[in-house]
Regions:
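N-terminal cap/lid segment of alpha/beta-hydrolase-fold proteins
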Residues: 1-41, 90
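Short beta-to-alpha linker loops that shape the active-site pocket of alpha/beta-hydrolase fold enzymes
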Residues: 30, 49, 77-81
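Short amphipathic alpha-helix adjacent to the substrate-entry channel of hydrolases
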Residues: 37, 55-74
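Short beta-strand element of the alpha/beta-hydrolase
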Residues: 39-50
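Serine-hydrolase catalytic-loop signature spanning alpha/beta hydrolases and amidase-signature enzymes
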Residues: 50-54, 73, 99
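Core alpha-helical elements of the protein kinase catalytic domain
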Residues: 64, 94, 98-102
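Short phosphate-binding/catalytic loops that engage adenosine nucleotides
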Residues: 71, 81, 112
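Gly/Ser-rich "nucleophile elbow"/oxyanion-hole loop immediately N-terminal to the catalytic nucleophile
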Residues: 99-115
Length: 115
């Protein structure tokens, strides 16, 4: 398994402003001798609820469930209230999805199966 963290603000060269988070964590399948490399579907996970909290209970366990089903899973650690204000929360979600679409080939993702 390939586990990485990507600072989306650094990747897009955006000023962070008051944002504290905006980190994307990957749980990707590694190419092995037993399995031929292939493009995989990807899922973007937003753990938590109502932009009020990020839930550790909905983080790795959810990512690993999708991973076991053949997905490469990505978890967004996003800013929440009161620090995270509109539009910061939506911008971080947009940055995560744009990153996955831009880097799909490099990450061996199926461009038509990113959700």
């Amino acid at each position: 398994m390939i586990c990485e963290s990507i600072d989306l603000y650094a990747y897009f060269q955006w000023e962070r402003g008051g944002a504290k988070r905006g980190l994307l964590y990957s749980y990707r399948h590694a190419a092995t001798l037993e399995m031929a490399p292939r493009l995989r579907p990807a899922i973007l996970i937003f753990p938590g609820g109502g932009y009020e909290f990020v839930s550790s209970r909905e983080w790795e366990s959810v990512a690993l469930c999708y991973f076991q089903e053949g997905f490469d899973a990505f978890v967004l650690e996003y800013d929440v209230a009161p620090i995270g204000q509109y539009p910061t929360l939506i911008e971080q979600a947009g940055m995560a999805m744009l990153y996955l679409r831009r880097e799909a080939r490099h990450l061996s993702l199926r461009e038509d199966r990113i959700a």
